[in-house]
């Protein structure tokens, strides 16, 4: 018996890029950034719709029975648009996604406690001290400050799927 796993390899995505850059030099679109995109995922920089991303990744779920995930990135607070979430889940189901995730920002101002999507500064008190909760592939691991440099670079490059 065997199983194929679409591994996230969170630490390796940055480590292998550095090793390849040393060995092969800086290759545009390959080793010129701090990370490799995990598994069979569409490039995080690719401006693609939610449905397109799901349809592109779905065929790989059937052949990676040992584990897989498809995630989409939203630009707002998910709880404010429950119908959209339900539609995304339905598309994931209909396309055969075995494990799906809907990522959305969860930010909290350390200074005044404001919760919501915060860009550079808190909209209430202008503080730059922000707790930024994000998901790495399939799990939450604390705020961005606990992520390795490769994963922080990837998160910064992630486009929102509309």
Model-predicted regions and their roles:
Residues 1-162:
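Long, C-terminal-biased catalytic regions of enzyme "large/alpha" subunits
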């Amino acid at each position: 018996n065997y199983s194929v796993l679409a591994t996230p390899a969170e630490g390796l995505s940055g480590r292998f890029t550095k090793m390849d850059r040393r060995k092969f030099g800086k290759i545009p679109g390959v080793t010129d950034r701090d990370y490799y995109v995990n598994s069979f995922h569409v490039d995080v920089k690719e401006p693609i719709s939610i449905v397109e991303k799901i349809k592109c990744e779905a065929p790989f779920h059937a052949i990676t029975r040992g584990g897989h995930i498809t995630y989409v990135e939203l630009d707002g607070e998910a709880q404010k648009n429950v119908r959209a979430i339900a539609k995304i889940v339905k598309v994931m189901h209909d396309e055969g996604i075995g494990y799906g995730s809907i990522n959305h920002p969860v930010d909290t101002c350390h200074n005044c406690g404001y919760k919501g999507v915060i860009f550079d500064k808190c909209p209430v008190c202008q503080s730059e001290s922000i707790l930024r909760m994000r998901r790495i592939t399939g799990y939450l691991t604390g705020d961005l400050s606990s992520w390795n440099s490769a994963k922080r670079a990837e998160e910064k490059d992630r486009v929102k799927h509309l």
